[in-house]
Amino acid sequence: MFKFNNKALISVFSIFFLINLVFADPTDGCEMDTNTLFITSTGDVFYNSDVDMGGFQFDVDGATVNGASGGDAGAAGFTVSAGGSTVLGFSFSGATISAGCGTLTQLSLNGDATGLSGIVVSDPTGNSVPFTYYVDSGDDGGVVEGCTDE
């Protein structure tokens, strides 16, 4: 017979919980670094921007995009089109998505998205704004092992 040790069981669950907290995906764009995009497993594309956005384009890695709708792009009246793995969002009327954070758009996917690449974001005058894909480093500001910088 196997005998359960409650303390050991609680310790194991605590370790899994802490690992999940450290490496968990963001639940909204406000948790992310500035000027980043992130795609969730359900196809929500989060953003965090310090400038108003006049348009965006990116490729979805690992999946085919069947469609795009909603989010702050939809609320701003953007036309968001998807073809293959590429998503393009802009406004015919010159509308913008205000600086801030949230859900940029919601994608219908075929396959499992592993990230976004080829990210291009423009401000309202068409100038390119440097954006990257958000990757949580899990860095808590502590000491980096093997680092000897003073």
Model-found features: residue ranges?
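Primarily marks secretory-pathway-exposed extracellular/lumenal segments that are disulfide-
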Residues: 2-150
